[in-house]
């Protein structure tokens, strides 16, 4: 039986990304605090799906992933040419970590 986990996760990612895009097409500065927190939550959820899709796809293609972490997966995905720019992904990891571990309204607005 063919492993379709990466395809199922990719479909979930596409749905999550569409919801994030919908939110980002609005004027973020007009959002109330709860709405802003919802957008950040959508970003975090979408990013989690994104790096896990990369991991699942690379494993499906036979790549050996020694370390299962977002940074390790992104670096391998870049080396294996699954993504064109690791820096953008690494910044997203930093943004996600910043929002997960701190609360600073200025940083919140910047992300």
Predicted regions and their residues:
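Solvent-exposed interaction patches of small proteins and small membrane subunits
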Residues: 1-111
């Amino acid at each position: 039986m063919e492993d379709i986990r990466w395809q199922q996760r990719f479909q979930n990612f596409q749905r999550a990304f569409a919801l994030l895009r919908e939110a980002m097409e609005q004027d973020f500065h007009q959002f109330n605090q709860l709405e802003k927190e919802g957008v950040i939550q959508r970003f975090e959820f979408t990013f989690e799906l994104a790096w896990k899709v990369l991991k699942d796809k690379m494993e499906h293609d036979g790549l050996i992933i020694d370390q299962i972490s977002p940074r390790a997966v992104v670096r391998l995905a870049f080396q294996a040419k699954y993504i064109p720019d690791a820096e953008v992904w690494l910044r997203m990891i930093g943004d996600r970590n910043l929002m997960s571990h701190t609360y600073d309204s200025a940083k919140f607005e910047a992300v």
